Amino acid sequence: METIKRLIWPKKEIFVGDFAIGVNRTVPVDVFQLVCRVVLRYMRTGKIECESDSLSKFVVELLKTDCAAKWEWFMKRRQGGDYIVPLSIATIPLMPLLSCTTSVRAVSVGVLGCGFSSNIPIPRLSVPRKGLLLRLAAGLALAPICALAVYATLPREKLSVYKLRTEARTHMEDEKEATDCLVVESARELKGKDGEDLLTGSRMTKVVASTGRRRRTPYAAKVAQVARAKVGYLRNTPENRLIYQRVIIEIMDKDCVRYVDRDVILPMAIGCCFVYQDGVEESAALWGSQDSLGVKXGGLVRLPGVVTQINRDIPSDVLLPQEVLEVRTGPPIAKDRNIFMVAGCPSQARFLVHNHCLKNLKRGLVERVFCVEKDGKLTRTPQPTKGSFGRLSPFRKAVCEKVGVAHRLGYDGFLSYYSGAKLRTYTRAVESLHITPVSERDSHLTTFVKAEKISTSKGDPAPRVIQPRNPRYNVELGRYLRHMESKLMKAVDDVFGETTCIKGYTADEVGAIFRRKWDRFDKPVAIGLDASRFDQHCSVEALQYEHSFYRALYPGNKLLSKLLEWQLHNKGKGYVPDGTITYKKEGCRMSGDINTSLGNYLLMCAMVHGYMRHLGINEFSLANCGDDCVLIIERRNLKRVQGTLPGYFLNLGYTMKVESPVFQLEEVEFCQAHPVQFQGGWKMVRNVRTAMSKDVHCVNNIRDLATRRAWSNAQHHGGLALSAGIPVVERFYSRFPLYDMPVKHQRIDTVTNVHKWRGSGGNYHVTPESRASFWAAFGLTGDEQVALEDRLDRWEMDLFGREGVDAHEPSILDSAVA
């Protein structure tokens, strides 16, 4: 190296007068550093630290890292278009061996008795024998050059990114955590009071500049101050330390703090969060006091049903010629419903129930069956473009091939799937079918207003209606489909390559499914797909596509085809005390159909599968619960999905809204529940505000004491099965008193609804990790969770006293941010 320097930069003597006083050499240049920088520039690696003391070691280490980065890209992130250029270059050595010859082919055409002929040259590749050795030598000469070019064009990420990712894996327990944190961001400098550099660099690039310990302390105090401003003053408890830790990590992410500095700053910043200024502790003692008014009252309150104040007619241009809606007004007879509520719960949300009357039934049919609202006006639902569902046929073919040919159930086999009141209803239908076969009249709809809990915050929404067909029709169609539902959903899962149809799983199992889905991706992002009134948007074409699944399982079955055809042309009547409504509707999913759930699963899965194939995106995960879906993708594909998904579904006749993306697992909302970590793993937990307000309301008539006991027992056992080990929610359901089981009767079968309370339960305790995860899901800090649990401990239910008055005491749930 010194010899090279002397040749390039010779010594120059400095003379003063006639005497030489020294030797001057230009500023020395480190050739090693120069070569490193040139190589790095050529290799597009960014800045990395030089840890080798010789050029040969550096080059060897660089090649190893380069090979490893390209191999990782091929194994984990490859896409079809990444390797077009390398494969094209690899074919260059074969070109000298090939020769293109042209052969002439005579083509004759006869038109109206006249013949025309012409010669068409046709190119053809061949390997001529003449000059083969020369061509082979040229190909061999090009081979090493092309091999180097192929290697140079193989895709990979920047070597600095790969090196940091590798180092992060060695120092962090969770490899996914190291991958998630590495996001490309520009470098940033933080200046001190005197203009000095506090932190230099970014999360993606390491630089030689370092930060001394005395520089880190002021930044830790500053981060702690910002964290307290975000979540407030919290007590020094394990769960609150975890909450502060999460907030501080987010702040350091935005500030691009290096990992080596984070390791020192994080514990100091967490400690600074609990160091308060003078007077803060005295003030916190006031607002943090748990000595509030006792909540003794928990009596039962009866709230009357409501009637909608909106009366709208169907515009003349909406109905098809074969569609009808006739309203006949009867005597003003009213049969009001009631909703019962337990007073004293720490939530101000209130719910009401719609009465079963003519005004509610008419508005429900007009706005939830016939019309949708667009720009303040009623209009017909959007219709699919011609051939749009035909493009989804590959999905149907793949699913049906996995299921194979099915066989129809006997009557006894169909009845074995039911128990209780539904078994008695279907048994009578089977006895009737032995006498008279099924007919078109059995497919007619009986319509009534659904008794559901309506939040008062929604104003005056359109009532929901239920439209069941005759049990005789359900029995005949159920013999074809009831036993095939699980097989079809399993086949859909196989086509997607993972669990996709979320049905029949416990809350713990669904939480574990979402954890596995989330861990599949390097940088996951979840978006909710909100299908506005999915059943109403099911057009005739959509229903025909769904029916094609069933016809493929029973090829040539005429009775099944007839039963399915009756679903395309619906006739129904609605009887209420003050009138009747008769209607005919083409298409539209009827909420009482036996294949409603299965059909919605198949339609939504098929449309999402077709959409992702349309985009050419293979890395995605779908969680489907009928019309409620969550799509998990890589962050780099987010903008493509957000920009094109609504238009694609509109071509299929569905109004689909893409909800705001979430980048943390606890923020994912699926069926009004969030994944929350607890002692046993992950569990889907209902929104705490919805659970604590909705579940103290009951739309069933619980005036008799036996039904009240059954309802309280069902809330206690079912709620704990769904929320064992979860903060706040477990304490809430434990407050429902347990009573001796009453004598079993039909009403209690309706109230208990055992199938709705599937959960693992278990003896789990609330841990600091579960409190931190609960905070990430619902925005309630550890202190707020403890305060709510203390409030619930003082809440006593009295279900057998006289009816009380609705009263509300303010709580944390009223002002906490969801």
From Swiss-Prot:
**Keyword annotations:** Nucleotide-binding, Nucleotidyltransferase, RNA suppression of termination, RNA-directed RNA polymerase, Transferase, Viral RNA replication
Q: Which CDD domains match?
A: Tombusvirus-like_RdRp
Enumerate the GO terms in the molecular function aspect. nucleotide binding; RNA binding; RNA-directed RNA polymerase activity
Is Transferase there in the keyword field?
yes
UniProt xrefs under Pfam families: RdRP_3, Tombus_P33
The EC number(s) this enzyme carries:
2.7.7.48
What biological processes does GO assign it? viral RNA genome replication
Location of the RdRp catalytic domain: 524-641
What the protein does comes down to: RNA-dependent RNA polymerase that plays an essential role in the virus replication.
State the family named in the UniProt similarity comment for this chain: Belongs to the tombusviridae RNA polymerase family.
Q: What is this protein called?
A: RNA-directed RNA polymerase
Origin organism of this chain?
Cymbidium ringspot virus
